[in-house]
Amino acid sequence: MFLPRPDFRIALFICFMAVSFVISRFGSEVRPTLLLALPLVLGHVSTGLIGFVLNVIAGHHSTVTLAASTIGTALLWLPMLVPMGTLISLTVLVSQLHGAERERDIGPLFRQALWLAMLLGLVMFTFLSVVPALLPLFGIVPDIVPGAAKFLHVVRWGSLAFPLYFCMRYFCEGMHCTFPTMLLGFGGLLVLVPLSYALTYGRFGFSEYGVEGLGIATVMVMWLQAVVFALYLWRSRRFAHLQLFAHLELPCWARIRDLLNIGLPIGISILMEGGLFIVTTLLIGRFGTDEIAAHQIALSVAQLCFMIPMGVAEATTVRIGHAVGRCDLLVMRRVAWAGYAIVIGTQTLSASVLLLGYDVIVAAYTDDLVVASLASKLLLFAAIFQFPDGLQMLSSGVLRGMKDTRVPMLLAMISYWGLGMPLGLGLGFALEWNSRGMWIGLIIGLTAAAVLLGWRFRVVSERMFAGIP
């Protein structure tokens, strides 16, 4: 049973007026941010579409396959979030060096970031090797455990490729070069779709691997993207003067420490947020196969929408880092407000799509009526948290560009684990609202993060203008 579509014209009008006001004051910075963000957004959307396609393929194979891939993917993302976040420090430092015209320091920094990426890849491989044996301890429905374990055993072989790819990607973004992210994202999608379909269902001469096929295809695409990115940087004339691969350097712990001082709090912050969703997924696994399948449908759609503000936030990080490197605080503030205007606009669009088209979206995933009904309700919650999710992401990006990472880490911890998770547990388990209660906890945690990180941006920017370190 699908829900009636609410009338949200007043909310849309308010958002439109807010965006119009900010653009009227800071419009000159909107266009450069959009030009830098567009390839990043498209690259992230391609990543989101990969998750969407994998879920559609798994969902039409069987509900158990979808549930197993959901648990497996959640546990895959848990160690992936740390290198994703930690290596963002490379974008921050490269953009500031580029803005300060100290490009001779970029090549050595990049080579040390590669060492850090390999170290993080080793940690990721170890985690994915150990965690399948622990699956029964999570209280997940027994039917799901074998498939999730098989998926994790396969995808661990992409542990090194993943952080190396992000290291190269973050370097390019710091240099205002965002098209490789877009091209490799869609290239990976074009390879993954037929490959995962063939391996999951046993088409085009391949054996039927089920959920393992999704893992095999994912690993192959991870390595393909990493190798192609490395070849691009090696052959690119644009970066030839930086001598990225001129020679092999031993690890320099002083430079790696600089990367970790900025990046590790970012990695922990992202782990706090991503971990909230991952643990929520594992807990919803206790409610049964239908609940976890419906949750995954709603979550994958919400994650696809999230790719847009993520790209805008990354572009804002680069532009703010560049402005800070030039000591241009006025431009820094204008870029930040332009980013907020863009995100409010994109999130209004995302929420509108979810509110208007949730039944069509659910039908693309599954023909199971019970799962479809549950997923339709959860998509309405996903529409609500588009705004706090986008705003907290943008605030995080702004603060990263200003090299403020430690206090935001603590604010994220308070918001997600001090507020969002306890409320979700209370509503989901104590009041027996099941997945709906857990999603309300997500909304509250994201809203708290949006408010606190926005406040932090105001405090830090006022200190910078006052000349206070």
From Swiss-Prot:
In the UniProt record, does the keyword Magnesium occur? Answer: no
Q: How does it sit in the membrane?
A: Multi-pass membrane protein
Q: Where in the cell is it found?
A: Cell inner membrane
> What is this protein for, i.e. what is its function?
Multidrug efflux pump.
Q: Which gene encodes it?
A: norM
Q: What is the originating organism of this protein?
A: Xylella fastidiosa (strain 9a5c)
What residue intervals traverse the membrane?
10-30, 34-54, 74-94, 121-141, 179-199, 214-234, 264-284, 292-312, 335-355, 369-389, 409-429, 437-457
List the GO biological process terms.
monoatomic ion transport
Question: InterPro entries this protein is in?
Answer: MATE_fam, MATE_MdtK
Please give the family membership noted in the entry: Belongs to the multi antimicrobial extrusion (MATE) (TC 2.A.66.1) family.
**GO MF annotation, one:** antiporter activity
* Name the UniProt record assigns to this protein: Probable multidrug resistance protein NorM
Q: Name a GO CC annotation attached to this entry.
A: plasma membrane
The lineage's top-level taxon is: Bacteria
Q: Name one Pfam family in it.
A: MatE
Keywords for this protein: Antiport, Cell inner membrane, Cell membrane, Ion transport, Membrane, Transmembrane, Transmembrane helix, Transport
